[in-house]
Amino acid sequence: MNMKKILSVIATLCMVAGALHAQELANFNFGGRGRPVVSPEIQGDSVTFRLKADYATIVKLSGSWMPNPYGGTIDMTRGENNVWEVKVALPSPEIYTYNFVVDGVSVNDPQNIQVQRDGTRFLNMLIVPGERTENYVEANKRGTVSHPWYDSKILGLNRRLTVYTPYGYENNPKKKYPVLYLLHGAGGDEEAWVSMGRAAQILDNLIEKGLAEPMIVVMPNGNGNQQAAGTLNLPVKQQPNYHDSNLSEAERSLLMNGYVRSLCEEIVPFIEKNYRVIAKPESRAIAGLSMGGGHTITASNLYPALFDYICPLSAAGSATPEQVAALKKAGVKLYFLACGDADFLFQGSEALDKTLTEQGLDHIYFVSDGGHTWANWRLYLNTFAPMLFK
């Protein structure tokens, strides 16, 4: 076959592949020959969701703003060109997640490329504009999110971090920065805070407005048996059962506090070796939600002189009077405790607040509406970040 024929065959194959891809997209839900499908569409005090589903018999909308976000749904109506739609009242300003239920199967909105990953689920985002969400959208001056790896001898794994460096970090080679270690909750990983938590957008906006100090934010993977987020499909290390009577005290201690030890003895030194940071307690902060709040409390209990800023959020954990006394002696500059009044861990936060008060440790106890939700954790980050390193 001569070169002209070869090129002709290649061109034909490319055209066929392109046509097949275009046909696939057209069949999917881009509206065919009718007007383009727009979803979601905010108009005044309402928002309309649409899905082109030619062969569906029942289509419903499920959204996190509904009274029962894990089971509540609203019926959608089939319209022209098999486009299903429903118009609902616009919820109050916040970031919400939603999906469609097509003949009993949950599917994402293919018209909305804004998605968040919560553990193993990918969900569409609806950002309702307003004062609450003004720091949750892109700023004009944006930092950089990267994913370095560190070796953990304690956990026996090569592990992945998410690191945010503020706008201007690359162009100021002599400038050093304080560091916030920001920890996720159960079911999350090193990507949770930049996906569901909008940490990069929040820090970008606060720094751009002059409300927060430029800082580096380190977001580790809090699952001690994981190398990285499940999206990388890496093997998970098998761990012994904590209640196994054959375990030694050292093995049991590693199961309990191995990750916190790795955080304080390996991740902190790794960051201080590889990034331009101010390696002093007054330039280190630690915060975490739920399980990460427990890790925050444990880290501050075991290493009281390491962090001058401590922020447990919706936390599972406690501190003894002796541990609080050690924090006072170390000169903690900020202890920011936060929880929602409907959170299932609220009583634990109440108890910790009482202990801190009785032991005379100055602290802020921030109680918000609502429960164990990302809406609260974004609010907390947006609230305490301006208090750091001042």
Predicted regions and their residues:
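Bacterial Sec-dependent N-terminal signal peptides
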Residues: 1-24
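Short, intrinsically disordered low-complexity segments
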Residues: 3-4, 32-34
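Non-catalytic cap/lid and distal C-terminal segments of serine-dependent acyl enzymes
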Residues: 23-31, 37-73, 77-390
